[in-house]
Amino acid sequence: MGANSAAGQNSGSDSPKLILIHLDAVSVPVLRAEIDAGNMPNIKRIFNEEGLLETAITYYPSKTPFIISNIRDGTSSSTGELVGWDIPGFDYGKDLSIEDSFLKMALSKQRISRANLLQGLPFFSGLKDLALMNTLDLFDDYPVQEFYWYKADSYGHFEGEEEYLRKVRQFDERIGKYIDKLDDDINIIIYSDHGMVFGEGVELNKQINNRFSDEVKVYSYPTMYLKEGVDEETTAKRVVNETDLDFAFFLQDRMTAKGFFENSTLYFEYQDGKIRYRHDGPDPFDYFDNGYNGEFLTADEWLSLTIELDYPATPVKVFAFLQNPNAGEIVTSLDNTKFNKTGYSQMGNHGGFTATDVVVPVMVRGPDVGYIGEFDKLWLQELFNELDQFTFKQEPNRDTHYISSRYDFSTNTNRTVAAYSPAYRFRLGADIDFGDFNGADLNQVWGKYDIVRSQLARVWIGGGVDFSRTDTVGMFMVRHEFRIRNFSAKTSITTNKNNQFTLAYDIHDNFSLELTNFSAVGFRLSL
């Protein structure tokens, strides 16, 4: 635990501890193939005998903003708000652009985990490993932590399957080292939000814009929003016939979803909490060849029957999403041989309802969560319903108080700083100088507020009064802290030019040695 933590100050510090790791874009078929090939020795060692659930199914649409923003509350796909990246008004009262959706998704996360989004980009990906290891020191401040591993997703989109698999294997290496350092009483859950489809890249947005500009208001794969007065059935059929999309569904009436695939017409009929599937033409899902007899089934029955097929529980997923007031009038999907090619997703993508998109692993270990690995099946949106004993988004009651002292050999002065934290994210302090150890002068008083915190860094802004000059003056300050386990680097910039750069090393939970401006040596005691 770092000396900057607020150890013991969290009202939930006696609650069970949990690290919840969101492993982006790894489906069960990929994970199982990598385990069987011997490429995931740590996952196999830690989870394969018990604790690896391979029969979980995620949301449709299998898109990151929809899943992240809804899963914590156990929200179903029929009611979740953030259904895609680009959304017309509906329940929001205004259109949501890609930038709006990204911000809403980021703000739905635990505060210290939001920077994981940037760390998933190739340019910043080197910080991801450091951030993960830093979570080991944050459990006293945050008994329940969330961590988002985006590397596989980002590299799958940008670089393709080979680099994607390298990042999946890299996760195995990193998680092995991490769990070996994790205390046995700390629970861990690793879940994936969706898979990643490679193959032929097809530019669906260009196809829709070129051929359906008169009918379609917005297309954000897999959802299609139509202009007023456009016939849904005619458009859905044309979409399948005139684009690379394989499936298109719409609500024929309140109880029936109708769709098209090549020369087949497909129906999902709802009655008394159950759904029946029927088709005119070939069965693209192969349900009737695998034990289905045309009866009405519950959602769980559909999942049990189809979890090992190419299109698991598709009737449930499509019908549920079409009930969502923010969904488009038509919902679509590619098969697992093609992906939607965009500016961001040049080499791979996801979002549809194939097994490669939606069958995801859940890995668990720990005294309070181990039983989840024994489930026969799991709808991913129900995962958080199993975690009622954990409190998410809790924060410390306050930050640490501290006293620091350092001797500056260039000026022969000793400076002592006393800081008090009345509440979390606030600190008040005073700097006192002792010249030649004879007498004391109040140098400055200050207050600061934490505006950014991640697993790696913290940024404070504040102000105060400088008494060291002939004329007392006010000052503004910005302070940045960067931490890697026991080592930290701190930069303080002030308008009174009392700028500082400090390197620190924690030799105990509450005690660190410091070097400031490469001329002053001292210590810091946290309380």
Question: Model segments located where?
Answer:
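Metal-dependent active-site segment of extracytoplasmic phospho-/sulfohydrolases and closely related
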Residues: 171-206, 328-333
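Outer-membrane beta-barrel "beta-signal"
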Residues: 478, 501-506, 516-527
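Short, structured active-site-proximal loop/turn typified by the sulfatase FGly-forming signature C/S-X-P-X-R
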Residues: 31-79
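A long, amphipathic alpha-helix that forms part
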Residues: 136, 145-147, 153-189, 234, ...
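His/Asp/Glu-rich, glycine-adjacent segments
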Residues: 59-165, 170, 273-308, 327, ...
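Short glycine/proline- and aromatic-enriched beta-strand/turn motifs that initiate or cap beta-hairpins
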Residues: 393-437
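Repeated loop/turn-to-beta-strand initiation elements of outer-membrane beta-barrel proteins
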Residues: 424-430, 452-461, 483-491, 499, ...
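Active-site neighborhoods of enzymes that stabilize oxyanions during catalysis
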Residues: 219-371, 380
